[in-house]
Amino acid sequence: MARVTVEDCLDHVDNRFELVLVASKRARQLARQGIEPTVEWDNDKPTVVSLREIAEGHVTKDILKQRDQDYQTSSLDLALSANSLNLEGFSFQ
């Protein structure tokens, strides 16, 4: 496994600040959303994998335009769940 440098990533992303945004968003996708990486995982952490993907040109700043999957449960879903479980007196706000 080769080391990833910021300079390698900056060939594909405009500046360091944008690199942080792109890498963190991709790392969250890998860690929380179960999206398959485009490079070998090699027992690395999601942040390292995301930087390797950027350095190899697989992930670009276009990822910032994508909407994140929303894992928050709506109040209606919670209320329906409480109703089906008969949780009387429990309030969802």
UniProtKB/Swiss-Prot annotation:
SMART domains assigned to the protein according to its UniProt record, in alphabetical order: RNA_pol_Rpb6
Catalytically driven reaction(s): RNA(n) + a ribonucleoside 5'-triphosphate = RNA(n+1) + diphosphate
InterPro entries per the UniProt record, alphabetical: DNA-dir_RNA_pol_omega, Pol_omega/Rpo6/RPB6, RPB6/omega-like_sf
GO biological process, one term: DNA-templated transcription
Protein keywords: DNA-directed RNA polymerase, Nucleotidyltransferase, Transcription, Transferase
GO molecular function: DNA binding; DNA-directed RNA polymerase activity
Pfam families found in the cross-reference section: RNA_pol_Rpb6
Gene Ontology, cellular component aspect: DNA-directed RNA polymerase complex
Ranges that cross the membrane: none
Record EC number: 2.7.7.6
HAMAP family in UniProt: RNApol_bact_RpoZ
Functional summary from the UniProt entry: Promotes RNA polymerase assembly. Latches the N- and C-terminal regions of the beta' subunit thereby facilitating its interaction with the beta and alpha subunits.
Assembly behavior: The RNAP catalytic core consists of 2 alpha, 1 beta, 1 beta' and 1 omega subunit. When a sigma factor is associated with the core the holoenzyme is formed, which can initiate transcription.
Family in the record: Belongs to the RNA polymerase subunit omega family.
NCBIfam families, A to Z: rpoZ (TIGR00690)
This protein's name: DNA-directed RNA polymerase subunit omega
